[in-house]
Amino acid sequence: MEPSKFVVKCGNYAVLVDLHILALGDQDNANWFSPAHRKEVGSLIRDALEPRVRQFQEARYQKIQSKPRKDLTPTAPLCLEGGNVRLAVHFMKRHVNLRCIVRQHYRELRVFPERVVVCASPPENSALPNGNLNLDVSEQSQSKYFSNSGETANPLQSSTATKRAVLQKIARKTKIQPPRSQDNQESKTGQFQADNAEKGSRSVLQRITRQANIQPQQCQDDQVYKSGQFQADKQEKGSGDVLQKITRQANIQPQQCQDDQESKSGQVQADKEENGSGDVLHKIAKQTNTQPPQSQDDQEFKSGQFPAGESEKGSRSVLQEIARQANIQSPHSQEDQEFKSGQFQVAEECVEACLPVPISVSSIKSLVDVKALSSSKLSNNKDVTESYLDTTGPRRRPRAPSSSGEDADHQKTKRLRLGQSAVSSDSNNPSSGIAAPDSVCSPQPEISQTNQSGLATSLRGLSVKPVSSGSSISSRPAAREERKGGEPRTSRLRRLKKS
């Protein structure tokens, strides 16, 4: 049946109600619902809607409004029961805001934002006005959900139904089987015990008879076998001990001693060849000093085993070896002593040559005289001085040749002054005189003397350098005289210009 709609006024809100009328029994129509039932439904709904509208207004005027949440699970319906009708009320949120169209008559009214759905059904055990009979309790106990009789009589065979049937069969079997199984077990256990008793008695008798017949023979055989083994072991052990004792006393010990002597003699000969007789003597002396008790014990033991002739031969051979080593070592020791004495003398000569030579005043004076003679020779040798000055001193401009006799006199005076200044510079410089004695007095070969002569010539050249400056200073008055003569002055310090 199609739902009927009506409006309920609660304060300033108009609440829209959707009424659904449920059918009664097998009847598809809703003839049982009358206008009296409608008035009763309106009064019941108004009493339920007033607290709902009041709650909505209070929540609206609050400062902090809670956001509406979408409830996925539907709330339980509100059940109301009247005299002739039963109601189930559902409140559903409307997502569209509705307004009143006619504002003149309904200016103050507002549409409630929730929709109300009401399901009406007749109450149980109540007489309907249309002459329908009351329903029996027995008929109401069965479910009338399925309208067709075939569906109710033959329900669908689902998986749950099949499972239930299987479980019922299993339960029936378990109820019947336990007593039978107990009886079978008891009978089987009784038979098994009887069989075991018979078998046990028979096996015990058989074992007793067998042991009575077999044990005496086995005991005799075991005793005979063990006694034979024990006697054989005794005989083998006795013969083995006797043989070991005889061989040890008679044969084994002498052979071991001979082998030890041969190995020791081979080692001694190898030591002689490698390290010489001196090392062997040191070893023999150490052994005799460090091992006296052991050697005495060994000699006593060997003397008890060997005859006296063999011990005497061994002592003689040892003495002969010591004498040979003493004869061999003497020439070697003499040669070593001579070689060491020669090395010591050479070392003493080298040390004496390296010692510093004392310097005396007479040696210094002799060196000064030698330098004076060498400087005079240098003044006579014009070419040597000029070449040396050209190589060591600054380059000077060549003077023009003069034909007058004044130049020859000037050169003679210059040479004399050079010789005097060299002697004075040598006497004033004590360092040059002190450095020379080491080279003169030291015992070195001719090569060192040639090197000393070269050093002396270099020292002489160094002593000539200041003389050139002195001669240039002393020759100033001669240059003034030449100016007075009218000749132009030529500067010696200027260099030739490159053309």
Swiss-Prot record:
Residues 142-203, 250-276, 288-341, 375-499 are annotated as: Disordered. InterPro entries: SLX4IP. Residues 478-490 have a biased composition (Basic and acidic residues). Residues 142-162, 179-194, 250-268, 441-456 have a biased composition (Polar residues). Residues 421-432 have a biased composition (Low complexity). Belongs to the SLX4IP family. This is Protein SLX4IP.
